[in-house]
């Protein structure tokens, strides 16, 4: 017999992990499955721990997940780490400010993300669950704070720069 419990960690020590599952079997060994929201983790890790190479970030994630098991020390066993994310976008997208197409496949972020995902695939206990990006809802938009200032006539369109745009992918 196996029981299943879902634990959503508080915003304390485990704030980078959204949830993890605890599977308890008859042998009293607690098997833990950790679920990682990939986009959220990368964003938070870059902010908290700084920029790193793809291999360093993958190793960091593995150690970070295992550290949660060591803190508990109640006979836990790592069943699997489920990493949820989408593959990087490889489209040509029109940039309205530059007035030209940007090939995202040639970007450093595309290369880094593919390397990172390949690193995770090669690690033990990791299972990647890849989603799909919408094919129609992709483009550059003006950042909300600049759009608000533009609509309130606090700035004019001539004050808008390339840095005021961000890629919006859904």
Please give the residue ranges for each predicted region.
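Short, Lys/Arg-enriched N-terminal segments with co-localized hydrophobic residues
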Residues: 6-28
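Domain-level signal for Mg2+-assisted phosphodiester chemistry and nucleotide/NA-binding surfaces
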Residues: 21-152, 159-169
């Amino acid at each position: 017999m196996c029981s299943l419990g879902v634990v959503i960690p508080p915003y304390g020590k485990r704030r980078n992990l959204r949830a993890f599952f605890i599977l308890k079997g008859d042998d009293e060994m607690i098997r833990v499955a950790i679920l990682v929201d990939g986009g959220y983790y990368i964003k938070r890790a870059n902010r908290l721990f700084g920029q790193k190479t793809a291999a360093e970030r993958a190793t960091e994630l593995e150690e970070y997940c295992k550290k949660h098991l060591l803190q508990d020390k109640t006979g836990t066993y790592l069943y699997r780490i489920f990493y949820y994310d989408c593959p990087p976008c490889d489209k040509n997208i029109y940039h309205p400010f530059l007035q030209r197409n940007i090939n995202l496949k040639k970007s450093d972020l595309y290369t880094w993300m593919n390397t990172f995902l390949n690193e995770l695939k090669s690690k033990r206990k990791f299972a990647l669950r890849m989603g799909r990006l919408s094919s129609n809802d992709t483009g550059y938009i003006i950042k909300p704070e600049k759009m608000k200032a533009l609509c309130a006539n606090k700035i004019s369109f001539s004050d808008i720069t390339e840095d005021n745009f961000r890629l919006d992918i859904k």
